[in-house]
Amino acid sequence: MATRIKILPENLTNKIAAGEVVERPASVVKELVENALDAGCSEVVVEIEAGGRRLIKVTDSGCGMTREDALLALERHATSKIASDSDLFGLATLGFRGEALPSIASVSRFALATREKGAIEGTEIYAEGGRVKEVKVCGMAEGTVISVRNLFFNTPARLKFMKSSDTEAGHVGDLLTKLAISRPDVRFIYNNDGRTIFRALDADLRERVATLLGRALSADLYPLDFHDGPLGVTGLIAKPECSRSAASHLYTYINGRFIKDKVVQHAVLQAYRNFMERGRYPVVVLFITVPADEVDVNVHPTKHEVRFREQGRVHDAIQAALESVLRATPWVRKQAAPQPFASPPPASEASATRVAEVRETLARYSPEKHLQQSFTVPPAATFQRQQGAVSLPVAAREDDTASDKTESKGYYCSLSVIGQFNAAYILCQDGTDLVIIDQHAAHERVAFEKLKAQFAAAQVESQRLLFPETIELSFKEGATLREHLAELGRLGFSLEEFGGATWLLNAVPRLLSGTDYLRTLRDILEELQTLGRSRTFADALEEILSRIACHSVVRGIHPLNGQEISALFAQMDATEFSSNCPHGRPVLRSLTLPEIERMFKR
């Protein structure tokens, strides 16, 4: 009786393997360039035609191969990078499976020319559809040249899934950008249809990033250097204003290998969570180093995912490393990153004179609709008060006297206050820059950081109500409240069941006194209802704290006097992450003198 299970022929198994390894032209480039880097090259030249369909050619200056090794390289699972199973847990190379070359050769017309260092001649091999057709001696420079023509010529079904030439060329460019950033010591050249797309000379990391991602972005990157024993996190991170709508600019590397790992991405987003609105992604170039035996890279065909032995430690180290830079908000405090190119010249004396003239004009301009009666603020003067009390965080009122006595000259305290616009924005001058501060966002950040510190110390200030208030809750809201009653108590709420669907509210967080705290409580319960089984109260804590902070501070039009502005600025200088509110919105924006002059065609 004939068997139904058959051993597949080698050419078919190679095509199946190619389906996992070779998804598109960029996949071919990835495997070939990684081999070149493993070979110790100092230069890689990548050329493609028709998006990689017609030709992919990779030339490197690596160690090259002998005739015997070149032939073995086209056999499945033949590699020089591992010899035993223990080597899988101490990998120091990008490639190791020995699948790439035979898989690529099985779906293309493949040519390999190589010459080992010190050899007097090279070897050239031609294969078609995985079968070696010709082997001969050749003359060439030391290194390796691989040409892949007519990709997927024998698998027409795969060709149907190929995109346009421009799209495929774009994928190749993105892939090469990732690889080139990982090795700034290696020259990378990328040519598409005879046109040079980029030429990245060997340089330091900042210069390499400037070449590939643009000098404007490079100017907004700040260095990172964090170590926790054998675990290290280094690289460059951008200020929040450079955020993107997708994760395309998360350049993350584990031991030099580009990865798209959920643990790493979550750590990055957690660090930036208070700086960006939801749905935005930062720009980071991170190099994470861990002992080779602490990470498994053999868990995905494309090696883009890894598995850490101590996942939590790696996550926390990445988050702590990023927060160590973000906490200082260097882009606000003028701690400019070193530039790989010349800075613009300083403003001329004439420009400075024009700034003074503009400021003098602004001081005289005071339409009642938008500004307070007096626009200029002498050090001891105050704005003319409008009718009604100003709602400020408690800390601001308590610290008024102290802030007058302090000699702190942080960034915010060093600003020269011009006035208040629409009783919602504080206008300041910083040298020749015009700085606009959203007073609500600033108060919100101060209140949030204070509340977070109080919660961590179990010392949230609570304000007991003179008369308890009743609140009617749905069955679902009531169940949520019972489940999280203790946590809400730590937040400063005191509630007890009154009967049926009615609850008594006896106390609220002190920050919320004088506000619509019932609405805030309902919003928190709604937030808790969306947690689900996969999340805990701790996961939603920062969202809840930011909601309380937002509801507790001044909103809309609220005039502030000079003492109140000084107190706010002193608090901002003492507050971490002060450039953004807890929801990620910016606290301040700056207009440089050249930008203002361009507005007026100067």
Curated annotation (Swiss-Prot):
GO terms for cellular component: mismatch repair complex. GO terms for biological process: mismatch repair. SMART domains: DNA_mis_repair, MutL_C. It comes from the Bacteria. InterPro entries: DNA_mismatch_repair_CS (IPR014762), DNA_mismatch_repair_MutL (IPR020667), DNA_mismatch_S5_2-like (IPR013507), HATPase_C_sf (IPR036890), MutL/Mlh/PMS (IPR002099), MutL/Mlh/Pms-like (IPR038973), MutL_C (IPR014790), MutL_C_dimsub (IPR042120). The gene is mutL. This is DNA mismatch repair protein MutL. It comes from Geotalea uraniireducens (strain Rf4). SUPFAM superfamilies: ATPase domain of HSP90 chaperone/DNA topoisomerase II/histidine kinase, DNA mismatch repair protein MutL, Ribosomal protein S5 domain 2-like. The lineage of its organism: Bacteria, Pseudomonadati, Thermodesulfobacteriota, Desulfuromonadia, Geobacterales.
